């Protein structure tokens, strides 16, 4: 309805389709330190959707995450620094084939969670179902493309290169 220069818009509540409803709240009650999931017994922060699922337009609670503090942040940072170990840690020195296997295993497990991740994308950032599916699939494709690029880098680095009459085998190191 138009009233002078003021536009008044009326919104009608529309029920969320059942297959997209949040039926179970997520409670993330652990966090990662030194490669281990540590149980969190402190306070939690609620995670709300930008989408309302009530006629009163109340926020939709999706779940809770740990309200980690400074001490946990320092432990996580120290853990990451120790794991990298200035380029001499397990991951940076791992054989290419083992890294690739780890990433392929990860992405295969990730694909098994597609439906829940797609639903959470819809609720957390307001994407529609089709766009959320595309976002997930693009991420999976990107991981596979990165693996293929890494394989190419490894193959190329195994070759001798000639420059100014000098043959060299150039490899990456820590």
Label each region the model flagged.
Residues 2-65, 101-105, 137, 152-174:
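Terminal low-complexity tails and localization/encapsulation signals of metabolic enzymes
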Residues 53-154:
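Glycine-rich loop-to-alpha-helix module at the N-terminal edge of alpha/beta enzyme cores
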């Amino acid at each position: 309805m138009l009233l002078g220069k003021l536009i008044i818009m009326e919104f009608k509540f529309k029920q969320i389709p059942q297959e997209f409803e949040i039926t179970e709240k997520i409670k993330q009650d652990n966090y990662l330190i030194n490669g281990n999931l540590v149980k969190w017994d402190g306070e939690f922060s609620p995670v709300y959707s930008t989408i309302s699922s009530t006629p009163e337009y109340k926020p939709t609670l999706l779940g809770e995450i740990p309200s980690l503090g400074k001490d946990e942040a320092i432990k996580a940072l120290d853990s990451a620094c120790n794991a990298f170990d200035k380029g001499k840690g397990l991951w940076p020195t791992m054989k290419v084939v083992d890294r690739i296997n780890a990433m392929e295993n990860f992405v295969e497990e990730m694909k098994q969670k597609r439906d829940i991740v797609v639903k959470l994308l819809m609720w957390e950032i307001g994407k529609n179902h089709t766009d959320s599916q595309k976002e997930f699939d693009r991420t999976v494709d990107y991981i596979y493309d990165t693996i293929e690029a890494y394989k190419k880098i490894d193959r190329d680095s195994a070759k001798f290169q000639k420059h100014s009459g000098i043959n060299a085998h150039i490899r990456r190191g820590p």
